[in-house]
Amino acid sequence: MATILQNLPAGQKVGIAFSGGLDTSAALHWMKLKGALPYAYTANLGQPDEPDYDEIPRKALQYGAEKARLIDCRSQLAAEGIAALQSGAFHITTAGVTYFNTTPLGRAVTGTMLVSAMKDDDVNIWGDGSTFKGNDIERFYRYGLLTNPNLRIYKPWLDQLFIDELGGRAEMSAFMTQAGFGYKMSAEKAYSTDSNMLGATHEAKDLEHLNSGMKIVNPIMGVAFWKDEVEVKREEVTVRFEEGQPVALNGKTFSNTVELILEANRIGGRHGLGMSDQIENRIIEAKSRGIYEAPGLALLFIAYERLVTGIHNEDTIEQYRDNGRRLGRLLYQGRWFDPQAIMLRETAQRWVARAVTGEVTVELRRGNDYSILNTVSPNLTYKPERLSMEKVEDAPFSPLDRIGQLTMRNLDIVDTRDKLAIYTQAGLLSAGQGASPPQLKNDERK
């Protein structure tokens, strides 16, 4: 049986991930008129630009849905977001500024929870608004089939009949107006936005051109910190972690992770923290460009990484970061629940995050400009007395100890010099020209 349907399955239940926007509204009504039985499912992901979630299912019913459900995905999204933070599952960075994979995290939650809700209604055909050029078509495909092995996929934007009849936003708006819904297109923006409570993604249209910078974006989770007229005051923030879990902000304890993330968003958003401009490789290897917001995750990640570096040794940190980059790619590719991702994630949560207990105080300024003011943890292995430049009693090692340690280094120094001489004689290194120690040109080996 074909997994992907190229034509509308008339007379059958078809689930649609319904946002209430023009595209999914027109698609739902069109499917109804063509004889399908559309079921609408809307994910509440805490989108910062969504004013009224309850209105969305009501719209779906007006447009012809047999049933419309609002699925609260916020707790699951918060849990997955913290898991990503604990494992450092972020592989896209530019000059140290991070993209926190907020859209891939949202897709992992949406793809599994909506398809699970569809199964409850005996709906085994799923459609959504992703296009064939993007990442989401593959992410939703994977998560959908992982959740329901009997799932078949119908996407209006892969159906030539739909494209011929409603191929653009103007056509879809006219279609809805003629149907009596008086649907008005929103003002055309210079870019497209997708968001959840973890972060926002701005891309496409004018942002496809690299000479259009971040300044054309109107942030939805924080301030436009680059504008001189926007007042941004310095602010000190204290973040507390217990066994890898963020639990308090400025001394206020949160038992609900969703509420903590929302408060972190408010704090970070006042400064424009966590905004980044990234060029990335999509799953199909073509490059795309996005402007991202993630004020809350950025704040939490600053504190988390500070504690990680103060608590764990160098090899553990190296493994955490290497595995985090691998895990970030898997998350981006729609493989967050694959065995190899679970292995990497749970390793970090068990052996890195569980030791992360403490408080970090940060001074936030404009954008990603901040200073760490204090770090406190019962688990710190940072011991200033070990390396103090002042005279201390009961020093952990003496000058004689260091002489012995340095003398042992002679073994590998000699071996390294021999190897460099071999490379020089073989013509792999040019003696004295900066590629190797200049004194090798006087080496007497023949």
UniProtKB/Swiss-Prot annotation:
Q: Which residues of the sequence carry a binding annotation for L-aspartate?
A: T131, N135, D136
Q: Gene Ontology cellular component?
A: cytoplasm
Which CDD domains does the protein's record reference?
A: ASS
Q: Per the record, what are the reactions this protein catalyses?
A: L-citrulline + L-aspartate + ATP = 2-(N(omega)-L-arginino)succinate + AMP + diphosphate + H(+)
Q: What is its EC number?
A: 6.3.4.5
**What UniProt keywords apply to this chain's record, in alphabetical order?**
Amino-acid biosynthesis, Arginine biosynthesis, ATP-binding, Cytoplasm, Ligase, Nucleotide-binding
Q: Which residues fall in a coiled-coil region?
A: none
Question: Where in the cell?
Answer: Cytoplasm
Q: Which residues bind L-citrulline?
A: Y99, N135, R139, S192, T201, E203, E280
Identify the metabolic or biological route this protein is part of. Answer: Amino-acid biosynthesis; L-arginine biosynthesis; L-arginine from L-ornithine and carbamoyl phosphate: step 2/3
Molecular function (GO) terms for this protein are: argininosuccinate synthase activity; ATP binding; protein homodimerization activity
According to its UniProt entry, the protein's GO biological process terms are: argininosuccinate metabolic process; L-arginine biosynthetic process; urea cycle
Instruction: Output the NCBIfam families linked to this UniProt entry.
Output: argG (TIGR00032), PRK05370.1 (NF003779)
The entry sums up its family as follows: Belongs to the argininosuccinate synthase family. Type 2 subfamily.
Q: Which PANTHER family match?
A: ARGININOSUCCINATE SYNTHASE
Describe the protein's quaternary organization and the partners it interacts with.
Homotetramer.
Indicate what this protein is called per its UniProt record.
Argininosuccinate synthase
Gene assigned in the entry: argG
